[in-house]
From Swiss-Prot:
Induction info: By stress conditions e.g. heat shock.
UniProt cross-references to Gene3D superfamilies, sorted A to Z: 3.30.420.40, Actin, Chain A, domain 4 (3.90.640.10), Substrate Binding Domain Of DNAk, Chain A, domain 1 (2.60.34.10)
Function: Acts as a chaperone.
Record key words, sorted: ATP-binding, Chaperone, Nucleotide-binding, Phosphoprotein, Stress response
Keyword Transcription regulation: no
Highest taxon listed in the record's lineage: Bacteria
Pfam family, one: HSP70
Gene field: dnaK1
The family this protein is said to belong to: Belongs to the heat shock protein 70 family.
InterPro entries: ATPase_NBD (IPR043129), Chaperone_DnaK (IPR012725), Heat_shock_70_CS (IPR018181), HSP70_peptide-bd_sf (IPR029047), Hsp_70_fam (IPR013126)
Name of the protein in question: Chaperone protein dnaK1
Key word Protease present: no
GO molecular-function term, one example from the UniProt record: ATP-dependent protein folding chaperone
Species name: Prochlorococcus marinus (strain SARG / CCMP1375 / SS120)
Residue numbers carrying Phosphothreonine: T198
């Protein structure tokens, strides 16, 4: 098996890791950062930008820049909470009730998976550059409380990026792998994972390389962004009260509020108060309006009291499901930037009488764990075993709309569970299997994963036919359902992906489109890299010419300086054109000219300690001036007035300059 990377696909930031020589580490992106903002955007020229480049245009181009997309993956419009709709860009429901993101500049609507695929592609591209090899496989993490639809949608996003998902791994489990993969002692660990958009709790037993997940719980609509929104609401409400202007109705103002709120939240993790300044946030009857205020930690914590209360319930549920008490916990691992908030750390200390571990980086630990899982799959790490669980109960709808659970939550996976059902009417020739996921008693109150029909059942009285329904969950947490008529042996099975925002045809079309775009993107990148390299060389040449003039005067290495100046002008001219081939030739010529200049300067410096060498250099320079190939043919006496080489002219792209032209040295 080839190289497999580990990807933490986060709501706010994403990270990629890899295993090298048995040790996991994080790969920095092309910008040099170990985390990549999970932001995608289109510039005013309709060019796709991802990561930090996209983040920079959040305020100036809010309609075409998209963040926090993970909250929409695999979810229908009806499942979204109101706070998820408070974004500066436009989202809507399509005819099937799926979430679509509107991009005015491209005049297109995108499924969240399609945009998130661009984040995965950037992570893979940056890793390929670092590792100098092609990567097409990954372990991708998801919140432990992601349902089957959200997991399938995550796989779709990777598929659109041209990446095969070898394993879907729960984020808290990944954090536990990173924390305990090199520990030999036994312990009971609580992983408290508060990310940008989701919250997860997992309880694990770690012993001699075996990671046994006992229980998991969480909230996929609660994260650090909700704490930001508390500050946004506080600022917007005060401003509206004072000026009767609702800043949330203006996209640019809303984005500025989001950015300053995130910054204030981060600063209050280390300070007791922080200033908030937003000049020219709006315009009133008497001119521009500004926000100048201060937020202290006590006020911030009072704003977030309801969010802190929401963090408590999943912890209690996980403890109850595991059969453990808080006193049974030996270690606590904090994951996600949200756990840096003092009020969150204080909450954890009130729940579990254990000081949280400081041995892991909350922003990178999940990607490290994903890289460890990749090492397990490739066989590089052989002494580790992971036993995960399914986060939510799975079942089907029975008579009266009740939910019949076949696989309870926190069941170890992979797992297969079957039960026998019958018809509800006499002479019924088919049955419809409705698959649901959740903890409510009525099926309709849970999440519908899909349905299919088993036909060809022989006529019989009600309750006589026997239909066996089997649920299979693989190691990725993906579900397959089958139904078999025991009388005829007729069988119908389906892989559940009804919650995905994209059907199979859409996925295939987008894959082909992504391949086409990938070629175009590679050509664009190559062009940009070529121009950037040329600009770097131009700057080096200009700096070298200045240094030589200051050190040796205008006549030191005069001929070589002139050659550099000519080549330099050629490169600058072709930078303004689209002729990359000529630019490449001009760059090569400038490199040769710089080499000649540097060689001559080195020779000049040697004359300081060797006068005889200085005489040789002088006569050598005179010879070069009189008999250089730029002035004469190979035979110096073969002079002819029409010989173009006499003038030493250069020809790039049809532009001729002669050494006797006044413009030649300008």
């Amino acid at each position: 098996m080839g190289r497999i990377v580990g990807i933490d696909l986060g709501t706010t930031n994403s990270v990629i890791g890899v295993l090298e020589a048995g040790r996991p580490f994080v790969i920095a992106n092309a910008e040099g950062s170990r985390t990549t903002p999970s932001v995608i955007g289109y510039t005013k020229e309709s060019e796709l930008v991802v990561g930090q480049q996209a983040r920079r245009q959040l305020v100036l181009n809010p309609k075409n820049t998209f963040s926090n997309l993970k909250r929409y993956v695999g979810r229908s419009w009806d499942e979204l909470e109101e706070n998820s709709l408070n974004v500066a860009y436009t989202i809507r429901a399509n005819n099937q009730g799926c979430v679509r993101v509107t991009c005015p500049i491209t005049e297109r609507e995108y499924a969240p998976e399609e945009l998130i695929g661009s984040i995965i592609r950037k992570l893979i591209d940056d890793a390929e550059k670092y590792l100098s090899e092609t990567i097409d496989s990954a372990v991708i993490t998801v919140p432990a409380y992601f349902n089957d639809s959200q997991r399938q949608a995550t796989k779709d996003a990777a598929l659109l990026a041209g990446v095969r998902v070898e394993r879907i791994l729960n984020e808290p489990t990944a954090a536990a792998l990173a924390y305990g993969f090199d520990k030999s002692s036994s312990s009971r660990v609580l992983v408290f994972d508060l990310g940008g958009g989701t919250f997860d709790i997992s309880l694990l037993r770690i012993s001699n390389g075996v990671f046994d997940v006992k229980a998991t719980s969480g909230d996929t609509q609660l994260g650090g962004n909700d704490f930001d929104q508390k500050i946004v609401e506080w600022l917007a409400n005060d401003f509206k009260k004072e000026h009767n202007i609702d800043l949330r109705r203006d996209r640019q103002s809303l984005q500025r509020l989001n950015e300053v709120a995130e910054k204030a939240k981060q600063e209050l993790s280390g300070l007791n108060s922080t200033p908030i300044s937003l000049p020219f946030i709006a315009t009133g009857p008497n001119g521009p309006l500004h926000i100048e205020t201060k937020l202290d930690r006590k006020t911030f914590e009072s704003l977030c009291k309801d969010l802190i209360d929401r963090l408590l319930q999943p912890v209690e549920v996980a403890l109850q499901d595991s059969g453990w008490t808080a006193d049974d916990i030996n270690d606590v691992v904090l994951v996600g930037g949200g756990t840096r908030m003092p009020m969150v750390q204080q909450l954890v200390k009130t729940i579990v009488p254990v000081t949280p571990s400081q041995s892991v980086n909350p922003d990178e630990v999940v990607a490290i764990g994903a890289a460890v899982q990749a090492g397990i799959l490739t066989g590089e790490l052989r002494d580790l075993l992971l036993n995960d669980v399914t986060p939510l109960s799975l079942g089907l709808e029975t008579i009266g709309g009740l939910m019949k659970v076949l696989i309870p939550r926190n069941t170890p996976i992979p797992v297969r569970q079957a039960d026998v059902f019958s018809t509800s009417e006499a002479n019924q020739s088919s049955v419809e299997i409705n698959v649901w996921q959740g903890e409510r008693q009525l099926a309709s109150d849970n999440k519908s994963l899909g349905k299919f029909r088993l036909s060809g059942i022989p006529p019989a009285p009600r309750g006589v036919p026997q239909v066996q329904v089997a649920f299979d969950i693989d190691a990725n947490g993906m579900l397959q359902v089958s139904a078999t008529d025991r009388t005829t042996g007729r069988k119908q099975s389906v892989s559940i992906n009804g919650g995905s925002n994209l059907n199979e045809d859409e996925v295939n079309n987008l894959i082909e489109e992504a391949k086409d775009k990938a070629d175009v993107d590679r050509r664009k990148r190559a062009s940009i890299d070529q121009r950037n390299n040329a600009l770097t060389l131009v700057a080096q040449a200009e700096r070298r010419l200045r240094d030589v003039s200051l050190e040796f005067g205008p006549y030191g290495a005069e001929r070589q300086q002139r050659a550099v100046e000519v080549s330099l002008r050629d490169v600058q001219d072709f930078l303004d054109s689209d002729d990359l081939a000529e630019l490449d030739l001009a760059v090569s010529s400038l490199q040769e000219a710089l080499f000649g200049l540097n060689r001559r300067i080195s020779a000049e410096k040697r004359t300081d300690n060797n006068p005889i060498q200085g005489i040789k250099n002088t006569f050598g320079s005179l010879k070069d001036e009189l008999f250089s190939d730029d002035y004469w043919d190979d035979d110096p006496w073969d002079y002819h007035p029409n010989n173009n080489r006499v003038g030493g002219g250069r020809d790039y792209g049809g532009r001729n300059l002669d050494r006797w032209d006044n413009d030649f040295y300008n």
